[in-house]
A protein has these predicted regions:
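Phosphate-handling catalytic cores of nucleic-acid transaction enzymes
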Residues: 1-400
Length: 400
């Protein structure tokens, strides 16, 4: 019975009780979950995810995203991947998880990011004396440069010969001491400006990480100019150069940088961001670049159990994260340059082509993917990125 029919019934029979139909739920109705393809993960990752899930009891997709995001962070500066001679891309991945409060995503992130955070702290402490020495040398260099500028300026007013000072300055400028970079792997709740400046001037491989992504995507910089922030994230995913121009300060260029994205937000916030005029447009291509998950809530069934004495599978996972990060220790201001190029073996390429064509066939009118053409168009590239990361994380050599 419609609302109009009910109103008419009440008017004609004011003393008769009305039976209303089933109310529409206010919460979103999700399609039945597809089993998460945990068996497709590399054995090291699969065992760590499954073993931890038995204790933590978070939804499996949520734990897997944490493990895969840290795998992307640890491997993204080690290689690029080629689909053919012209289609070459980074191996970095973006993850976006829609989930409510209390799902224990932070706990899973803390467990699977432990090795990378420990590596970051260890390298920073080890390099601290070298960095302090370089900073002192740079201060001396700056004073010498300022002194030569003063000599040239004074000579300009007095008419003295300044050729020698100019030659000395020209030589000195090319001798600027380089300050070793200190790794900063995780940016949490960072603004667009802070992220861009660090990537341009700091450690060239990092991640944007938050279990309350609404703070980032709903920040002042995002609300003020969401298109610019999304353009930056899209460029970094593509591995392209991004130039930032400033009115009052010197601009900078982000080149040869790598970024992993791992964001979780409330489903309602994601809905608002994608629907409001000032939010993230589907046409921007940002969401399509993300691997998205909306796992069913497991709250109410997570009864306490004692943690295992040790998780050997998690130890093996952490060892691989550390080993991969060790290979990136020599990164410099130049960024992720001259990276090895991973190619698919003939068998892998054939399987990838079958997948590519199957997805493409579903994009036609009335096709399977007609409502999500933006996501489907990036699926094949995300697939080969995953394959490349599995290859790197397992320490394999040769083609994928």
């Amino acid at each position: 019975m419609t609302i109009e029919q009910n109103e008419l019934e009440i008017k004609n029979n004011p003393h008769q009780s009305i039976t209303w139909g089933q109310p529409i739920p206010l919460s979103p109705i999700l399609a039945p979950d597809c089993p998460y393809p945990v068996e497709a993960l590399p054995s090291i990752v699969r065992k760590a995810v499954v073993d931890y899930q038995q204790y933590g009891q978070q939804p499996l997709p949520l734990i897997a995203c944490s493990a895969l995001a840290n795998m992307s962070l640890s491997c993204q500066s080690l290689a690029n991947v080629a689909r053919d001679n012209y289609l070459i891309s980074p191996v970095s991945l973006y993850f976006l998880i829609a989930s409510g409060s209390g799902t224990r995503k932070t706990a899973a992130d803390n467990v699977f990011s432990k090795a990378a955070r420990h590596w970051e702290t260890l390298i920073r402490k080890r390099r601290e004396p070298e960095v302090l020495s370089a900073l002192t040398q740079h201060q001396v260099w700056q004073m010498e440069k300022d002194s030569l500028f003063s000599q040239i300026k004074r000579a300009t007013y007095t008419g003295e010969d300044s050729d020698y000072a100019k030659e000395m300055l020209d030589e000195l400028i090319h001798q600027e001491p380089e300050i070793p970079l200190q790794p900063t792997l995780y940016f949490e709740d960072a603004t667009q400006e802070a992220l861009a400046i660090h990537l341009a001037q700091g450690w060239p491989s990092a991640s944007l990480w938050s279990d309350e992504a609404g703070i980032i995507l709903g920040s002042h910089s995002m609300q003020g100019n969401p298109t610019r922030f999304v353009a930056l994230l899209n460029r970094l995913w593509d591995g392209k150069t991004f130039t930032a121009h400033r009115k009052t300060t010197q601009g900078f260029t982000i080149e040869n940088r790598r970024l992993t994205l791992n964001l979780m937000m409330q489903p309602l916030i994601l809905q608002q961001l994608t629907k409001q005029a000032s939010g993230i447009s589907r046409q921007s291509g940002f969401l399509a670049r993300c691997l998205m998950a909306y796992p069913a809530n497991s709250m109410g069934n997570r009864f306490y159990q004692e943690p295992p004495a040790s998780l050997h599978s998690l130890t093996h996972y952490e060892q691989r994260v550390t080993a991969c990060l060790n290979q990136s220790e020599q990164l410099s201001h130049q960024g992720c340059i001259q990276l090895p190029l991973l190619k698919m073996s003939m068998a892998a390429k054939q399987q990838w082509i079958l997948f590519f064509n199957a997805v493409e066939a579903g994009l036609k009118p009335q096709g399977q993917w007609v409502d999500v053409v933006d996501f489907a168009s990036k699926a094949a590239e995300n697939t080969v990125r995953l394959a490349a990361l599995f290859h790197l994380f397992e320490g394999r050599h040769g083609d994928i």
